[in-house]
Structure formats: C-alpha cells, structure tokens
From Swiss-Prot:
Name of the protein in its database record: Glycogen synthase 1
Bilayer-crossing regions: none
The gene coding this protein: glgA1
The keyword Repeat is annotated on this UniProt entry: no
Keyword Ligase in annotation: no
Job description of the protein: Synthesizes alpha-1,4-glucan chains using ADP-glucose.
Annotated catalysed reactions: [(1->4)-alpha-D-glucosyl](n) + ADP-alpha-D-glucose = [(1->4)-alpha-D-glucosyl](n+1) + ADP + H(+)
Residue numbers binding ADP-alpha-D-glucose: 15
The organism of origin for this protein: Rhizobium radiobacter (Agrobacterium tumefaciens)
Amino acid sequence: MNVLSVSSEIYPLIKTGGLADVVGALPIALEAHGVRTRTLIPGYPAVKAAVTDPVKCFEFTDLLGEKADLLEVQHERLDLLILDAPAYYERSGGPYLGQTGKDYPDNWKRFAALSLAAARIGAGVLPGWRPDMVHAHDWQAAMTPVYMRYAETPEIPSLLTIHNIAFQGQFGANIFSKLALPAHAFGMEGIEYYNDVSFLKGGLQTATALSTVSPSYAEEILTAEFGMGLEGVIGSRAHVLHGIVNGIDADVWNPATDHLIHDNYSAANLKNRALNKKAVAEHFRIDDDGSPLFCVISRLTWQKGIDLMAEAVDEIVSLGGRLVVLGAGDVALEGALLAAASRHHGRVGVAIGYNEPLSHLMQAGCDAIIIPSRFEPCGLTQLYALRYGCIPVVARTGGLADTVIDANHAALASKAATGVQFSPVTLDGLKQAIRRTVRYYHDPKLWTQMQKLGMKSDVSWEKSAGLYAALYSQLISKGH
C-alpha cells in the first residue's frame, strides 16, 4: 500500500509543534503494517540544508504561477518529496511567520501550492509511482482533497487529519480567483465560509474521510464549545469521522537509554530518578529539599491554561512544593510566571524559550507535570510524562482524558491510576488537583505504583499505526 502524506512540517527536519512529531513518526510505525509512506513537505531552507543528495524527479511548470521542482530523498527512515519552490519557501523567518513575528501575507498561496502539488502527485504525474491514497494534515494541507475533487481527479481516496481545529486557514474571498479552481468551488459544499475562503472547511467538505488525534476530541469538535464554528460542517460528516490517539517515538523517549537526561532509569529501577530531580533543581537554581517538584512544559498561552497556572503558583508553594516552567508564548503570561519566580525565590524557576534536552531532563526529574489545557486535541507531553514516571496532572479534555487514568476511588482501588484529572478547567479545579497530587506524593507506596503503571502504559505508535493502516485499507477497498 502506497500513501502520500502531505504536511507543512516534519520532525526532525522542521518543527513548530506536535504536528511535526506525528508526521515524522507515523510513517515509520506504518512500515510494520505494509504501508509505504512518502511525505510531501515544503522546501524550506532548513529542510534543504538538512538532507543529503536530493534528486529532482519532476518539474511543475506552473504551480499557481510559479515554477517548482520536486526532489526525492531518503532522510534517516523517512521517504521524502520536497517541493522546492524558492518563490514560496525561501524565507528568512519560520515556516509560517516572518522575522517580525507576523504571518507571511502569501501563506494562502504557499500552502495552496503545496496542496495542488499533492493533488497532481495523487493524479499520477510522477513516473513509476502513484499513491493508493493521500493523507493530508491540518489546514496547510487541507486544500489537497479540494484540488483532488475540483481541479484534478478524485480517483483515489483522501484522509484529512485535524490536529487542532483552532487553526483553519481563513483568508479573504479575493484570493479565490487565484486558486485555479472552478467557480462552483466557492460555495457551501466547497471552500466558502461566511463569504471568506477557509482551507480547512474546504478539506472537511471534500476529503473522503476525516480523522482527529483522539477519540474524545473527535466527539468534542461536534459541539459548539470546541468546534470553533465548524461543528456544523463536521456534524454533517460525522459518519466518516475517526478519532485515533497519537503515539510517541518510544526509542527517542526512553528513560533507560535517553542520553539527554542526567541518569538513566527504568520502571524496575527508579532510584536514579532522584539524581535527575537534583539536576533539575540545580539547573533552575531552586531548593533541593525533597519536596514535590511540579513542572510545566508548554506554549504559554490561554488555550494551554497558563493564565490559571500563573495564579496557582502560590498554592503550590504554600503546600511546600516547587515549580519549574519551560516554554514561551504570550508576553503577559511569560511576565506573570517570571514575577512568580521572583516572588518565590528558591521555590520557582522559569526558563523562557524551548529547549529539547531540558524538556527531557524535566520529564525525568520532576515528580509531576501540570497540563491545564482548555482544549487539547491529543497532547504529547502527557505521553512523555507517563513514559518517564512524571505523574500527569491534566484537564479532563480531549486526548488528555483519553490517555491519563484519573486517581479516583475506583482506579485507586483497582490499582489502575496513572495520573490526576480535573474538571471544570478553573482555578479552583486546578488547585484541588494540585492538593490531591501533593497528598498522593506523601504516600510513597501509592506514588511509586502510579509511576510504574504510567511507565508501563503503551504510549507508542504501534497500536495507533494499526488503526491508521486499517482505515487506509478500508478507504482504498471502498474506492472513492
């Protein structure tokens, strides 16, 4: 089975968030199920610099008015197709934002071109290779099924995965005439959305099937609270909507072999975790006194509940705990956390930015990680935490609810609990969860039991890859 995956980012070449991790790990996990995946990605400077000896395999003479070369290359275990279009992707900023921190004004064209190239590959323009289906990810690739329906050929099926419905690729109606689509594509059954153009809405309408990254999130986006205005469109296609939870790369995230942490350990031998805890305290220059050490590793935004977290810092300290934070985002939230660190010198440490090695060390050394997201399609941070014996304290939403077993009376009695959930997502709810966590921490036998259960949880891609492979087979066998 040959599948074309289409994405705006892929780990380890270019990453701004969890999308890259998923797109980079899933093809490798699918190999065991007989699925060969080729991933189409934009030819950003960082991507072209990272690969070795790419080979030109096709030339697009007119991709929305620009020429582009298609390069094929193997990078580690990934089979890549790179869309080398300097007019679109040769930028000095990031994948989506310029150096000023604002969206590139032509993002609509940059990612429509990526989708159009994908649709043409799906139609068979590459000599000697044509996919059996196309798997597009998020709004940046959501025009792929649109072009497959309107501009190319709908002979093969398409799957659109929604990683976060908050990002929809919405642009003014004035761009429609430049998208190389027939006039009737601008309508309710196409890409029109309240007199604007919405790439994601178009993909939701035209893909053969839809998926999102956890069963709970698949249910949530059917509601007005979480559907971000698209719940009606998704509801009309609920019969083809699937929720498949993300996994993690269990080789990269393995405390027994991880070279980024201070000391290795396993569920069978947790002693060395204490050495990592000491290393975290030293890094953040906070007290090393054996008290419960909480952490936050996150984008510092309202969606992630960081405003609540900033208000809950005093509660952690009053309970005798400590807190370390790694992340960046909203300047006001960064400031609130930095102020808390100044207020609680020796008890709270904050590092603004993102640091992959430090995130590994924090998972390996902190006792618990707090994830108070208002919505969370899947979340990977809590999966890393489970793997590392760092107890997740999570809002009961989306993938967080699906992957963490709350330490309620029933779960504690049956020895199944792996973390702490709270709802509603309010300051009081978060404070209560923190108090519960501190109480469990002071019961060493229970705490160790929860750690070991989490570490033994199957958070790898193996099961989820099987579900994707089965869905692919189902779509291909049905035809389009």
